[in-house]
Swiss-Prot record:
It catalyses: a quinone + NADH + 5 H(+)(in) = a quinol + NAD(+) + 4 H(+)(out). The gene is nuoI. The lineage of its organism: Bacteria, Pseudomonadati, Pseudomonadota, Alphaproteobacteria, Hyphomicrobiales. One of its GO terms (biological process) is aerobic respiration. NDH-1 shuttles electrons from NADH, via FMN and iron-sulfur (Fe-S) centers, to quinones in the respiratory chain. The immediate electron acceptor for the enzyme in this species is believed to be ubiquinone. Couples the redox reaction to proton translocation (for every two electrons transferred, four hydrogen ions are translocated across the cytoplasmic membrane), and thus conserves the redox energy in a proton gradient. [4Fe-4S] cluster 2 binds at C73, C103, C106, C109. It comes from Rhizobium leguminosarum bv. trifolii (strain WSM2304). Binds 2 [4Fe-4S] clusters per subunit. This is NADH-quinone oxidoreductase subunit I.
Length: 163
């Protein structure tokens, strides 16, 4: 009896038609894929991408050279050199470098920063041809902050109830 039912199933191509109708059901639905370089999917506000140093609205850099991000970085990818104290008693950085080859994008630097100076922005397209280009200095980080400030501020505002 088993061989008779298997013969009938194979004769009528039961599995083939089942797979065909399943394919046809999904063929006419909306596509789940996107054409990547030309279309981009949504990015979460908590996405951790390329690092950036932010500025205050008056143009002054936010980093106060407390070195908390350097101390908490598990990959030891951040190097900070603080300048002398200013007349108002605050400090600013003379050197702020991040070795993106070492960075593991954990976000601890962003969480440790008391003034939201160092953030991981929404940019994920920063591939390079050499390793040296992945060594971000202070000028590059400030440029990233200026370029992505609107998106970074929006993401921080969206995420603020959970911080």
């Amino acid at each position: 009896m088993g061989s008779l039912s298997s013969s009938i199933s194979s004769l009528f191509l039961k599995e083939f038609f089942g797979a065909f109708f399943l394919s046809m059901r999904y063929f006419f639905r909306q596509k789940a894929t996107i054409n990547y370089p030309f279309e981009k999917g949504p990015v979460s506000p908590r996405f951790r991408g390329e690092h950036a140093l932010r500025r205050y609205p008056n143009g002054e850099e936010r980093c106060i050279a407390c070195k908390l991000c350097e101390a908490i970085c598990p990959a030891q990818a951040i190097t900070i050199e603080a300048g002398p104290r200013r007349n108002d008693g605050t400090r600013r950085t003379v050197r702020y470098d991040i070795d993106m080859v070492k960075c593991i994008y954990c976000g601890f630097c962003q969480e440790a920063c008391p003034v939201d100076a160092i953030v991981e922005g929404p940019n994920f397209e920063f591939a390079t041809e050499t390793r040296e280009e992945l060594y971000f200095d202070k000028a590059r980080l400030l440029d990233n902050g200026d370029r992505w400030e609107r998106e970074i501020a929006r993401n921080i505002a969206i995420d603020s109830p959970y911080r």
